[in-house]
Amino acid sequence: MKRKVFEMQNKPEIDAFDTRILAELQADARLSLAELGRRVHLSQPAVAERVRKLEAAGVITGYRATVNLAALGYGIRALVRVGRADFARMSRFIDESPEIVNAWNVTGEDSWILEIAVVDVEHLDAVVSQLCLLAETSTSIILKTLRQHQVMLPRVKHMKEAAA
């Protein structure tokens, strides 16, 4: 039995320095280039060039602040699984709904998984009621987040074809 080889298509060349840069920026995107260079043992201009190349290659796609939604008044977060729904109507609903924090179009029994943030149960009911006009839904309130924003680095070793 042969194992399948999994490789990323159009994978940019990423070396150990780039990997360390990615780890540092994912942990703290506010690092200055000087501090980033100090941490990865490169000069500031060298780090700036590597970051620019990672951005140009689409490896780094943006920088953002992570906020505490509860501190902003959104006391409830929920995952809403949505059955088959018209793609254009769902896309429009997602675009027009500020409560939707993340939205994924997925395979399987559900067509969409939405992460929403709402003020209270009444607000949750209002959002889900609107979604129910588009498709069947199933809602789970998030009790606790155990992992958020996992640092991801390039794969070092690829699976090799091997006879089992």
Give the role of each language-model region.
Residues 1-164:
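A compositional/biophysical signature of low hydrophobicity enriched in polar/charged and small residues
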